[in-house]
Amino acid sequence: MNKRTLIVRTVALAAVLAAGGALAQDKPLKIGVTAGPHAQIFEQVKKVAERDGLKIQVIEFSDYVQPNAALSAGDLDANSYQHKPYLDQQVKDRGYRIVPVGYTVNFPIGIYSKKVKSLAELKEGSRVGIPNDPTNGGRVLLVFQDKGLIKLRADAGLKATPLDVVDNPRKIRFVEVDAAQLPRTLDDLDASAVNTNYALPAGLNPGRDAIAQESAKSPYVNLLAVREQDKDKPWVAKLVKAYQSDEVRRFVQTEFKGAVVPGF
């Protein structure tokens, strides 16, 4: 073997090894979630994904705004905490190039109270806390409309706000509050609508404690999201497969007993 041949083969071997290294995961994927059920579920996803060679670092956030900001900035590889109406609004408002890549779970929103046992008991002028973002606030207003307590403009859609209320016989006052803070308002307000991912850590279970609950067939199934430039990368398909596995489905059904339901 002459020197030239040896050099060529050495270079070729180095290229093969480099390619193999490129296929291997150099560092864990950073996945942003909100604290509570999303974090609990992703710890199970992490175990399933690791068997497929995918390393994951779960990073918890305490609000709905930062996970998309961090993903857009490149500080996360994906996030798992929001439904499509919320993501669509964020993309519209902030110009994010973030796309959904797979469905995860649904959190039927519940309405809770320490003062009344049903929506029918709400008196004239009652104050009700709702999330201050349009998509989740709209969810609550639709529940109140479905229960016959208010009427919304015909074209209000999924992102209705208190300004879209056109008939309100009991003059219910909807108080917009950051979603994460709503469990703390129950001592002061007549009722509050709390997203399940914030309700469960606060000791509230929609199946047991809610005085009213959104239908499980609502359009608010949560999703996995990534930057648009990453959506076709191999790790994305592996991540979705891990989340939508039978093992994760069984965990959700067993752990949350209907408070959180699989959406895949």
Language model: regions and residue ranges:
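A conserved helix-loop-strand patch within extracytoplasmic ligand-binding domains
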Residues: V101-K151
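Pocket-flanking alpha-helical
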Residues: Y64-G95, G110-K117, G137-V140, A199-G203
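Ligand-binding "clamshell"
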Residues: Q89-V101, V116, D188, A193, ...
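Short helix-initiation/N-cap motifs at beta->coil->alpha
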Residues: V58-A69, A156-R184
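Short, well-ordered beta-strand elements
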Residues: Q25-G36, I56-E60, R127-V128
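Beta->alpha turn/N-cap motifs
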Residues: G36, E60-Y64, G74, N79-D88, ...
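Periplasmic-binding protein-like
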Residues: Y103-Y112, N136-Q145, L200-F264
